Amino acid sequence: MESLLAPLKIVGKEGMEMTCADGWVRRVYTILAAYIADFPEQCLVACCLESRCPQCLVLRDERGSPAWSHPRDQKKTAEILRQHAEGLKPTAFVSQGLRPVKPFWANLPHTNIFRCFTPDIHHQLHKGIFKDHFVSWSTEVVDGGSDEVDRRFKSMSKHPTLRHFKNGISLVSQWTGNEYKNMEKVFLGVIAGAVDERVIRAVRAVIDFISYARFEVHTERSLENMDRAWSAIHETKKIFLELGVCTGFNIPKFHSMIHYVPAVRSHGSLDGYNTESPERLHIDFAKVPFRAGNRRDYTAQMATWMSRNDAVQRHEMFLRWAKGNGIIEKEGEEGDDEAEPERKRRRKEGDIEVRGCHGYKVAKNPGYGN
């Protein structure tokens, strides 16, 4: 990563001229502002243990608490790592939960790597907090367990805007982002009347938080409601301890929710940093190329398959462009005996054949009156 981001050290200080979207050339100072990664990679980049938070100094046993902790400081962390590398053994190395990894971000200008980490709605909220924890805990509370929950999912009324889980949810092994969202829409109705009212309030607080986190545009009011939902989660979570379905909330994904509102304020809406969109690339660039080979020396075979597939796609794009501009004949034109009578008829009737013309759509009614 240090070699990959080395050009940012120069352009981050001196800048470079770039053509902007409006056509004007401006001097731009490019910096590392966002880093999208899963939790293990975030801890590796932050040079901290996976039992600690990569963004703040919360203690390893207090990640389930709603209390705020001091954020990590990049300059101080880099200095502690340097001292440890020289054998000085600073006490902060252990107290801050660091590990001996060379930080590639130490000399990047105008960068705070700990504030670059962005929330991951797909893995942290949809899959982690909701599905792996609150759905599992709620299912254990229901009399009859997963069988009763499946029966209730099957009994849900059908609606055009809602997905009907006709086989329940216990047999689904691979979930997509859309399936998580569809389950969140109806889960409160599924457990209504089957669990304690306090469980419903806790699940509702989680769903409210996830809904606000998915907003494409935020206001101060939406952020306040999001923070209020987060507070409601901590106020109602103890019901799961009382019912004995969980042993605690010292969970990294549970603690990560405290950083969502600050991330929105610093980076904007979180939909642009969600890993749900690139998750589909695992199929296109990993699973499909792997299955295309014989599983031996699969790395080289996958690279060859992807390069050939890319070449085929580029050639296909060229053929589309060439046909659209009349460089090569389309099917059913020159050289096609079946199309010759139709072409003669059009010439005889005076029809004009136009190739490579661009079409434009005009609004039926003007946007602004004269």
Segments and roles (model prediction):
Residues L88, R99, N107, D120-N370:
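Terminal interaction-prone segments of large eukaryotic proteins
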Residues M1, L5, K9-V186:
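Domain-level detector for long, ordered catalytic/regulatory cores in large eukaryotic signaling
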